[in-house]
């Protein structure tokens, strides 16, 4: 498989695919009770190979076009519905999208480090999500990265306090 190739699909919504994070060979598919998929093991090869999805002009896409691109790239399955945390379906139009860039849990990623060098890509992603529904970005009062504090096309909300201050 290549990075971005579909590893499996949502059985209730087959157009929602889940993409491989690495290129290599699928070595195991582990299932639990009632054949619940627990894990797909991909042995990474030496050099990453990427599936091509082509490029597009974001300004020419509407919300449905963004959904189509997310489906094609295998990324749509990572959008969850609240309050139950289940994958959403492409036919559902959300009232709002919440992006959490707030570090309040121990051992969680530092968004200042994670975004370094990827600010333009991050903004493109936020702009794409905002075409689907009103988008909110939650950040920490301590964050100084301009990609977070001055994000465009979203409503930025600043949180402060210990876990679970910014639960989404």
Mark where each language-model region is.
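Short, Lys/Arg- and Gly-enriched loop/turn segments at beta-strand edges
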Residues: 10-21, 35-39, 50
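Generic structural motif
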Residues: 1-4, 13-28
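Buried, small/hydrophobic-residue-enriched core segments of structured protein domains
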Residues: 30-168
